C-alpha cells in the first residue's frame, strides 16, 4: 500500500522549494531540457527482448527453422521440437497436422497443448508442442508439410544458456554501446552542433575503446570549460546533500574529498577513485565510452566492476545530461559503492543477471532503476536519497523528497514491473527500510529466477563459479567450511 512521504521534516512542496532558488537555478530545473532524462537500462533491455522475439519470429524461414527445431542428430535420426498453432479450432485441423508426422514415420515422444502466451484477438488460444524423432533426410519435407496445415511454426529447442563472462578479463568483450544519445547522432543532444565538443568526446571515448582489464586507467587532462561545468554541478549538489542524502553517501563523500581528489576546482581521475573503492569494498572502475547495453552493464556488477564514463556533459547544459557522464557517476554512484552493504546489493543484481533471459534482464534493469538509480531509504525517522539518479540531479533530488511524488515500500516483485518515467521526474519512488533489508529482499527475488544453475563470485580469482553439478557445489562448500573454521577459531579466541 502506498505510504505518504511525510518522514522527512525538510520535505516541502516541490514548487515552493524551487521558488526559493535563484532565478537561474529555478529556470534550469523547470525547463524541459533539464527534466528530460537519458535513456535507461530498462529501455535497452526492453529493446533487446523485442529483438529476441523478432529473431524468434524470423526463425520461421526454412533454414533457420531447422536450426532452431533440431536438438540433436545421431545415426540418421533427428530429434525435432516444434511449436505451432492451428488454423481454426476444428478437430480436422489437428488430424491434418498429425497426418503430416505419420507420413514421414515420425516417432512422437511427447505431445501437449499450451496456452498461447500472447493471443491475438480472434486468434487461436492454444499452441501445440511436439517432440518427435524423424529421419534426418525427411526434415525439410516434414517441416514444409506442417507449415501447410499450421500457423506460427517455430523451433522449441532445448533452452540454451546465453553467454556471460566467467572471468573478469572477459569484461573486455562486454562493450556493446547504446548510441541513441550520442552527440554525433542525436539532434537534441546539447553538443550536437558543437564540433569541438564532439571531437573531444571522441578523444575521451578512445580511452575506453583501447582499455583492457588490468591496465591503469589513463588520466584525462580536463579543460578549463569542463572544470567550470564540474564546479557548477559539484557546488550546487553538495549544498543539498547534508539534508537530502543518506548517511552512507555523506560519509563516503567526505572520504573522497580527503583521499581521492574530490573538490570543486578539479575533476577526479578514475584511476585514483578506483583504487579508493577497491580498498573500501573491492569495487573497481572501468572506463566506458557511453551507455552500455543492459546485459553487459549488469554483468560487470557481478565482478564488482562499475563501468564509468570519463567525459562530462556539455557546458550549455550543466544541470542536465541526456546520458550518463562523469558528474552522474562520480557524484551519484561512486560514494554509494564505497558502502559494503550497498556494494553487495549492487553485485547481487549483477549475479542475478548472468545467463538470465531477456525478460528477466528487463525486470532486473527496472529493479536497478528504482533502487540504485532512484532509491530512497529510511534513516532515523526520515526519508533520504541513495539513488545515483537523485544524488546527481538537483531538481529530482528536491522533487523526490517533496510532498508531490508517491512513496511506496520497496517490494522487488512490484518494482520490477513498475512503469518508469524517462521524460520527467518520477511519480513513484520506492523506499527501503535499510540496505540490509533491501539486499535480503533482492536475494529472495533472485532465487526465483529460472536458471539451470546458480552462480557464486570467487573474490580470489575474480571469476564466476557456475554451480551446475554436485562436484561444483562440493568444491564451493569447501571454501565456506574454511571460512567457518576461521570464524569459529576467532570466536573461541575471544571467549
Curated annotation (Swiss-Prot):
InterPro entries: ACT-like_dom_sf, ArAA_hydroxylase, ArAA_hydroxylase_Fe/CU_BS, ArAA_hydroxylase_sf, Aro-AA_hydroxylase_C_sf, Aromatic-AA_hydroxylase_C, Eu_TyrOH_cat, TH_ACT. It is an enzyme of class 1 (oxidoreductase). PANTHER family: AROMATIC AMINO ACID HYDROXYLASE, TYROSINE 3-MONOOXYGENASE. The gene is TH. Pathway: Catecholamine biosynthesis; dopamine biosynthesis; dopamine from L-tyrosine: step 1/2. One of its GO terms (cellular component) is cytoplasm. This is Tyrosine 3-monooxygenase. Phosphorylated on Ser-19, Ser-31 and Ser-40 by several protein kinases with different site specificities. Phosphorylation at Ser-31 and Ser-40 leads to an increase of TH activity. Phosphorylation at Ser-40 activates the enzyme and also counteracts the feedback inhibition of TH by catecholamines. Phosphorylation of Ser-19 and Ser-31 triggers the proteasomal degradation of TH through the ubiquitin-proteasome pathway. Phosphorylation at Ser-31 facilitates transport of TH from the soma to the nerve terminals via the microtubule network. It comes from Canis lupus familiaris (Dog). Its cofactor is Fe(2+).
